Amino acid sequence: MARELKEVQGIIFKRQKYKEADLLAKIITKQSGIITLIVKGAMRPKSKLSAATLNFSAGTYVIYTSGHGLSNLRTYKKVQQFDALYRDLTKNAYVSFIFDLIDHAFVEYQPLGQYYNLAVFALEKISAGVDSEMITQIVQMKMLSAYGVKPELSHCVICGKEKGIFDYSIKLGGVICSDHFNVVESRLHLKPKETAILRTIGLLPIERLGTIKVSEESKRATRKAIDRIYRETIDLNLKTKKFLDELKLF
């Protein structure tokens, strides 16, 4: 495919030095997926492109691309900065992990569809001060389908029951009702309200998830469960997740 100028709307989420005065920046876009951009001269003093490619800058960018490999950033039209993320290390760590999680689920230039909307949702909510932990857990639950391990949350994986008391089984790939608790050794032994949280954040569309109020105890339990689901089904070992976990210890 011949190289062409293309206008994309997206969010810069990772950058590193490239050669003496240039940067490599990763941008997540809805239609064109994740793209690695060469940003010429971005390391030079007073470079306008440097400011427009700070992490978590969202806007419209004009790129020179062939649809594969490295593309070049030519200019930008309108860019929004999420200042709250620069002032708060914890918020920044949460958002960095979320974008890293999305990045590892797709190859470059693969359209993201609903997962782009999920990234925007997380960025805006965490920047606005909504519970970072719960927003991250929402993203983690919804990203399981992108990794090919979508859990069954709508009904019991054994009998199909949709209402009642439920627990979660990683081995069976979803929720099980109380009728089968005594025969499923692999269940996580979550409290009913904790399983209900996993079901709610996994099933409800993001636009229907309003103000999230969950106790610290429940958040710790659901975080532990989600981390175990990822560890036993995907095992990503992301540096951003390790940093986030270390940050929570302080």
From Swiss-Prot:
Keywords: DNA damage, DNA recombination, DNA repair. Transmembrane segments: none annotated. The keyword DNA damage applies. The keyword DNA damage applies. GO terms for cellular component: bacterial nucleoid. Signal peptide: none annotated. GO terms for biological process: DNA recombination; double-strand break repair. InterPro entries: ARFGAP/RecO, DNA_rep/recomb_RecO_N, NA-bd_OB-fold, RecO, RecO_C. Belongs to the RecO family. PANTHER family: DNA REPAIR PROTEIN RECO (PTHR33991:SF1). Involved in DNA repair and RecF pathway recombination. NCBIfam families: reco (TIGR00613). This is DNA repair protein RecO. The lineage of its organism: Bacteria, Bacillati, Bacillota, Bacilli, Lactobacillales. The gene is recO.
